[in-house]
């Protein structure tokens, strides 16, 4: 299915998917995925934006998904007299947790299964002085023979 790129911009500070937790209840282990910390709200917002931008059926072809995660600056990173460039984000959340939350949120809206996402880049940055925190997701199909080396 030839397709133009789909670009989604999700406003707000990026969030990572919390890792599954295990607890012992009555001598039995029970595993659950925590959903606090705004995760459910982020997923709902991402799904709403995706449904507005992409109105076709969920894709069932190999996909490339690139993600740019722009985090807010801390007070210690604020400058008053000089331009503030983007900085690499070297603290949590880990990039795999950021990616997992985005892929899970868009499953069933943009693609049938996140296993269809075969490649893509991720970048975590701290916002430049004039940037707002956000997550930018760029989705494109992979043409036959077009896989990256």
Q: Where is each model-derived feature located?
A:
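Acidic, proline/glycine-enriched N-terminal capping motif
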Residues: 1-149
């Amino acid at each position: 299915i030839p397709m133009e790129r789909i670009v989604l911009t999700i406003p707000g500070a990026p969030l990572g998917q919390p890792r599954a937790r295990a607890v012992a209840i009555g001598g039995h282990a029970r595993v659950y995925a925590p959903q606090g910390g705004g995760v459910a709200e982020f997923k709902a917002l991402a799904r709403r934006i995706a449904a507005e931008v992409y109105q076709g059926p969920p894709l069932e072809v190999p996909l490339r998904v690139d993600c740019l995660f722009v985090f807010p600056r801390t007070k210690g990173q604020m400058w008053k007299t000089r331009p503030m460039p983007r900085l690499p984000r070297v603290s949590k959340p880990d990039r795999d947790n950021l990616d997992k939350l985005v892929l899970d949120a868009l499953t069933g809206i943009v693609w049938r299964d996140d296993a269809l996402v075969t490649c893509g880049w991720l970048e975590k940055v701290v916002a430049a002085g004039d940037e707002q925190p956000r997550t930018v997701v760029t989705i494109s199909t992979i043409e036959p023979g077009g896989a990256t080396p």
